[in-house]
Curated annotation (Swiss-Prot):
Its EC number is 2.1.1.200. Residues 236-255 are annotated as: Disordered. Belongs to the class IV-like SAM-binding methyltransferase superfamily. RNA methyltransferase TrmH family. One of its GO terms (molecular function) is tRNA (cytidine(32)/uridine(32)-2'-O)-methyltransferase activity. Its main location: cytoplasm. Homodimer. It holds the Pfam family SpoU_methylase. Signal peptide: none annotated. It catalyses: cytidine(32) in tRNA + S-adenosyl-L-methionine = 2'-O-methylcytidine(32) in tRNA + S-adenosyl-L-homocysteine + H(+); uridine(32) in tRNA + S-adenosyl-L-methionine = 2'-O-methyluridine(32) in tRNA + S-adenosyl-L-homocysteine + H(+). InterPro entries: Alpha/beta_knot_MTases, RNA_MeTrfase_TrmJ/LasT, SpoU_MeTrfase, tRNA_m1G_MTases_N. This is tRNA (cytidine/uridine-2'-O-)-methyltransferase TrmJ. The gene is trmJ.
Amino acid sequence: MLHNIRIVLVETSHTGNIGSTARAMKTMGLSNLYLVNPLHKPDAQAIALSAGASDIIGNASVVDNLDQALAGCSLVVGTSARSRTLPWPMLEPRECGVKSIQEAAQAPVALLFGRERVGLTNDELQKCHFHVQIPANHEYSSLNLAMAVQILAYEVRVAWLDSQRQDATVQEASVYPVAEDLERFYQHLEQVLSGTGFIRRAHPGLVMNKLRRLFNRARPESQELNILRGMLTSIEHTQKPETPAPDTGHGRPQA
C-alpha cells in the first residue's frame, strides 16, 4: 500500500526542502516522490538534508506539470493553509491518512504540497477530491514544507499499521476513476453545458467550479462515471439536427 502513496511537491524553490521531505518520507516508509517543475533540480544541499534518504531523491519523478504527477491516481488530496472563496470537502490529517490507505490498496494516491510561500493555486486545488488542513496554532501556524509532509506521512503510517492489525475481510472494493478520466469528464460536461446554453463557453465561471466540487464530493465510481459520460453523449445526439433521408424517387406518382 505505501508504495502507492505519492508525495507531490509543486514548484519547490529551495532544494533543501526536497532533501528534508525525502527524510520525512523515508522515516514513515514512503518512497514515491514527485517533483512538479521544481525551480532548481536536487543538488548537494538536498542530498545533505536528506540525511541518508538520498535514494528517495535519486528515484524521484521530475515532471513538467501537475497532470503528469496525478496520472493514474484515484484519490488526490491537496494541502491548504487557509480558507478559500469556494469551500471544498475537507479532511482532518487523521482522516486523510485513513482514506489514503484505503484507496492505496487499489490505486495510486497523491498528496499535494504547494510552493513554500504561496502554496497551491485555486486551479491546482480544484483538481483535488479533498483538501486537508493541519490544525496548527492560530497565533503561529508557520509550518515549513518538510514539517507538513512529516505530519501527513505520519498519519498515513499510523493508518497503515492499523490496517495491518485488523482482521482481513474480503470485500468487493470500489473502483474509482483516475485523475485524467475525471478531467476528460469535466471537459465533456463543460462542452455539453455550453452547447445547451446553460453556461457561456467563454466564461464558465463558478458554475464549473461548483460542479467540480459536487462531483469530487460525490466520488462517482468508474462505472458511474461511464454512465454520466453516456448521458452527456446522449444529450449531444439530441442536439444534432436530424439529417433528412435522401429522396430516392420511390413512391412518386407516375406521369
